Curated annotation (Swiss-Prot):
Organism from which the protein derives: Catharanthus roseus (Madagascar periwinkle)
EC number: 6.4.1.2
Enzyme kind, highest EC tier: ligase
Protein name in the entry: Acetyl-CoA carboxylase
Keyword Aminoacyl-tRNA synthetase set for record: no
């Protein structure tokens, strides 16, 4: 059984990665 805090932490990390990825795409993609 996974605790809800772990799920919340993973969700936060995933959304952070998406923000970084979208900002990279706006700059013309990852360097």
């Amino acid at each position: 059984r996974i605790s809800s805090s772990v799920i919340a932490h993973k969700t936060q990390l995933d959304s952070g990665k998406r923000e970084v990825y979208s900002s990279h795409m706006q700059l013309g993609g990852p360097k």
